[in-house]
Amino acid sequence: FVLIAISVIFTVVSLGFLIGYILINGIPNLTPKLFAWHYTTENASMLPALINTIWMTILALVIAIPFGIGAAIYMVEYAKKGNKIVEIVRITAETLTGIPSIVYGLFGMLFFVTTCKMGLSLLAGALTLSIMVLPVIMRTTEEALLAVPDSFREGSFGLGAGKLRTVFRIVLPPAIPGISSGIILAMGRIVGETAALIYTAGTVAEMPKNIFSSTRTLAVHMYSLSSEGLYMDQAYATAVVLLVIVMLINLGSTFVAKKINKY
């Protein structure tokens, strides 16, 4: 009990100190010019980076979600038990989860940016991030599907429903809270990612004209400001906005899961 109490206190104090430090140093530096439509060296606006982050998140999730959920459905509902291919996919997914983001960035730079000739672009960054979060979505969806009782499937088959109808009408609805949690986790990782995007999306602090334009997300914007050493106040202000976004994502996932569970 004592060790548990110490662990809880240490975790709460560490989190409180981190959040407090960022808020104290960042809130006083939040000024209207930081939300100017165009970035300049005078205003160091974060608005283009914020909009780029939204586009990057949407595009990466649009790519990753169908593949992640589809793969999980196949492994749980269609593949035979003990299938070696399924085991290989699971091991691969677990391995991909532990790979540092810088490695994903190097892969994205060599494959998407150079080999596929996409250049430093929104699309190259989104494709790299979709590969990065694919194991998260796939594994959480798989666990959510496995948590659905087999009696649901047996009852559906007993009433004459086919496999496809059973999966989409009977199995998926109870699994939606777990699937949503995985998507929210993926979203949080995308929003906070820096290393992979430096090598694939670039650091241009302007809104993209199209998916082949170089972009800078909020996390990369904060890194660029702090690394230059001339915009530390603006970097702290950016950290506050990024922290608020991540907290809202986490709170939103909890709220959505509770609402879905009610129905």
Where are these regions (language model features)?
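Generic hydrophobic transmembrane alpha-helix motif, especially the helices
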Residues: 94-129
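N-terminal signal-anchor/first transmembrane alpha helix
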Residues: 1-20
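Interhelical loop and adjacent transmembrane-helix boundary motif
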Residues: 42, 197-243
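Glycine/proline-centered hinge or cleavage motifs at structural transition points of membrane proteins
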Residues: 100, 159-160, 173
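C-terminal transmembrane helix and the adjacent membrane-cytosol boundary/short C-terminal tail
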Residues: 146, 184, 224-263
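Transmembrane-helix boundary motif in ABC transporter permease subunits
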Residues: 60-93, 106, 254-258
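Periplasmic/extracellular loop-to-transmembrane helix junction in inner-membrane transport proteins
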Residues: 1-3, 21-60, 82, 224-233
